[in-house]
Amino acid sequence: MKLLIKTCLAVSAATLAAILLYVIAQRPTPVSAATSDAVDRIAGKPDFSGIWEANNTANWDLLTHQAHPMVAQPGLLPNTVVLAAPVLALGSLGWVPGGLGVVEGDEIPYQPWAAARKKENEEHWLDRDPELKCFQPGIPRGMYLPHPFQIIQGNSKIQMIFEFANAQRTIHLTKMEPYPNVLWMGYSVGHWEGETLVVDVSDFTDATWFDRAGDFHSDALHVTERYTLADKNVIHYEATIQDPQVFTRTWKISMPLYRRLEPNAQLMDFKCVEMVEETMYGHLRKHQLVKHWEGKTMNVDITRKIPPGEEVLERYISGNPPAKK
């Protein structure tokens, strides 16, 4: 039986850099083109090395969508929503930006039971989205998160490091034995079809989503990626999705990925585990935060009462010691 090890501890970018030493050591010097607009090459193949980032709203919703509040609750009139408390507090920042879809045909072909599950996921997005818990994003979602990622290309493998959660993946360009476990980022084996890198990704966990709109998959997910340089600063990215347990047919997404051109472009640490300790481990608190529901909105009272006898200790812990008498 496949084992799922949910490793969510973020490591520093410096630690991940050490992992890349083997890839860098085997990496031959790129052959520079005659002009600045031509594509660098390694062993006769396009060199994808660099820092890249998508520029779309696919992480919010793969399909075409209008701007709408992140969280809402039913209003008195049909098709009218009432903003939930978190949205009111955030103002315009609490809204999802509108965007054009990246799915071919603008439709995800769910089986009936899965369509109902997707709708339920979307309604409970704040409780269920793995991104909120700092889980590794999976593929293809990692490719269009609103965070940059770095590609380092060698002869036998290509390494990708993602700023979000310091996630990483390896694309093996030589024949490898099947991996014995499931992986958050899948198991990737690539080959070249002319100027296009084709990557077969399998052995996924079922714990990742495609976006914040509740689009999901099972552990039978199979992704075929295609990377083609439109020019030296733009990758045309395609991903064909197969999952017979969830979808009625295969479907495809496509988008451009853009090279970051700043002279000092680099990945920064985004150790999101430290940002979600309450979400991940709040249930282990000795004195848990008070939660109550108003309709479909969960309110959290962060002004908890200090247990009797612990007032002085709590003041020192919070950096607000009692005044000296």
Predicted segments with their positions:
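PEST-like low-complexity, intrinsically disordered acidic/proline/serine-rich tracts
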Residues: 2-325
